[in-house]
Amino acid sequence: MLTAPLYAVALVALAAPVASAAPPGGAADLSWDVTTVDADQSFRGLDAVDRDTAWVSGASVSGGDARVYLTKDGGDSWDDVSPAGSAGLNFRDVEAENARTATVLAIGEGEASRIYRTTDGGATWIETFRNTEPTAFYNCMDFFPGGKRGLAVSDPVAGKFRIISTDDGGQSWEVLPDAGMPDSTGEANFSASGDCLTISGRDAWFGSGGAKSRIFHSTDQGLTWAATDSTIPAGEAAGVFGLAFKNPRQGIAVGGDFAAAADGVDASATTRDGKSWTNGGDLAHLGEDAAYLRRSVVVVGESGPVGGSSVSTDGGQTWRQFSEVGFHTLDCTNDGACWAAGGRGRVGTL
């Protein structure tokens, strides 16, 4: 439920190259090629299938329809493949199997939290979940390898985070029992990037903020969870915003404080066993999302007066800012492509 403010922007047509963001400080090895897809949208959902195919999702800053876009040519062109009747919704997460099959999550209180699924590249969508619990607010989702079992996490209901699961690729969802979920007081998820929940192998993790900044870990596909304090600051607008794992043991959490977005101190944490977390290097900007790119880790952040993109080559112990251009969400692929998306309908590729 803890979300960053959207940015006011003007409408721009489908993707034409806008700018190439040169990295400062001599970091000439990485640079964003930035494209505007739809400037009425703030993109916080992104799933990159490979260097050719990517899906992005967002919300209108002018009160119009929430949109989902798909590219199959490396970002040269984008198709509007949005579900019908999406006015007022906020598509904060999209998870794709390929160019035809994808699942998108709309966030919000009560019935605003919904899940849609397509198997024909967005030509048609089926609503497969609509929240009926007034106090629930779903923030992000992910799928286990194979694409059948998936999880989505909501802010606490009756003092515990709520998890829904699917075993048929998102065609149907059920609320899981909360007996295996630790108690939570004053915590919530940040739907900053669509990656407040992430999966690697059979393990799943999600982050929290608010009264505590914790990372919850499940080794049984979401049935039971253990909570560990992170080293990322807690606060009303502070906590863990995004998680990424190279494998079930090696991962990174990023976050910060939206109320002091220029402060990247203690904004990253790392794990070497999937369970315990240690303080990573300070960032020069807020960390909203992270992804592994070959032997490096990339972090992006856009919210607040200072945005940027940084890279680490030592597993998150030290960071080097390579661009003053920031984004809300990030995804890198097995074939070495890296995609990012953010406010004003922008998409970047490395």
Where are these regions (language model features)?
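Secretory targeting and sorting signals
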Residues: 1-22
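Residue-level hotspots at or immediately adjacent to binding/recognition sites across diverse folds
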Residues: 25-350
